[in-house]
């Protein structure tokens, strides 16, 4: 994001600021205007020309979000130790369910299948 800020500062500094007269203002017919976007007091907006194989235009960027995303990309990742139970054989006892049940599940019971009833 620093490159974009530096680039925009350089470009905007190169533009000379002169008082414009009526002769300097481009005369654009009202039918040719597509739209107007007022930035108001927003100072965290940057725009860049964008072009690829299928489209071209202006890309509007929220610099605050872009800087936060860049900081997240630059953080280093560290490995952490996996905490796992020691390996052991699976012990099945008569009447014991194979898997843990949900916290709010019904109590364990034998599966009862009736004719025409779906399994689940």
Swiss-Prot record:
Positions of the propeptide segment: 22-86, 102-107
GO molecular function, one term: mating pheromone activity
Signal sequence range: 1-21
InterPro entries: Mating_factor_a, Mating_factor_alpha_C, Mating_factor_alpha_N
Keyword vocabulary terms for this entry: Cleavage on pair of basic residues, Pheromone, Repeat, Signal
Biological process (GO), any one: pheromone-dependent signal transduction involved in conjugation with cellular fusion
Any one GO cellular component localisation term in the record: extracellular region
Function in brief: The active factor is excreted into the culture medium by haploid cells of the alpha mating type and acts on cells of the opposite mating type (type A). It mediates the conjugation process between the two types by inhibiting the initiation of DNA synthesis in type a cells and synchronizing them with type alpha.
This protein's name: Mating factor alpha-2
């Amino acid at each position: 994001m620093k490159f974009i800020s530096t680039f925009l500062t350089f470009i905007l500094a190169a533009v000379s600021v002169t008082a414009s007269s009526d002769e300097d203002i481009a005369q654009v017919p009202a039918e040719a205007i597509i739209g107007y976007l007022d930035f108001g007091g927003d100072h965290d907006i940057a725009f860049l020309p964008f072009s690829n194989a299928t489209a071209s235009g202006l890309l509007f960027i929220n610099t605050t979000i872009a800087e936060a995303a860049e900081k997240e990309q630059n953080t280093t990742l560290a490995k952490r130790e996996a905490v796992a139970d020691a390996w052991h054989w699976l012990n099945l006892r008569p009447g014991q369910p194979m898997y843990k049940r949900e916290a709010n599940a019904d109590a364990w019971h034998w599966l009862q299948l009736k004719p025409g009833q779906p399994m689940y």
